[in-house]
């Protein structure tokens, strides 16, 4: 992440101009919009995994920047440390997630009917299909439901009510491998360790660095070109 404090400060300035200090709940549409802006800014800060006391210092720095007060630290000296901090926090999050993920994958692999592939994916058939199986170069139409280890839904075509269509060789490795083992009309659960999902970078804000992902995938069709 490139040092982007200036952009964030500008956005915060808009929010601060619309909401009084110490405001509890946004009431007007403008206030709700600025509150939403604050939520978006918080997603940019997600990789830092800030504690409440740390967030107070971040808020103080952003407020001073917006109000053009004299900075309390030398930005040239401490600016580069922002990137160092992010890298350290992301690495720590990834290690924590991967450790929990390894235990989760091992448990999933021990369940009846589960099959662990050479890459580390765990595949469990939910419903057998009767059609063909796709090749990695095929385009497929699927319904899927993606969750984290704690059950949090991060993406779901099922919830959207609209199947997804994509080339099988342009998705995460776990999908490329796993969907090839589903026959048309079939449905399987894929447990995907981070190394064959989004890796140590994750896909913020929904997917943490090193996260293990769980998908229920129903293969509806192999799309003919």
Regions found by a protein language model. Name each.
Residues 6-18:
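Bacterial N-terminal signal peptides
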Residues 2-4, 20-225:
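Cross-family detector of peptidyl-prolyl cis-trans isomerase
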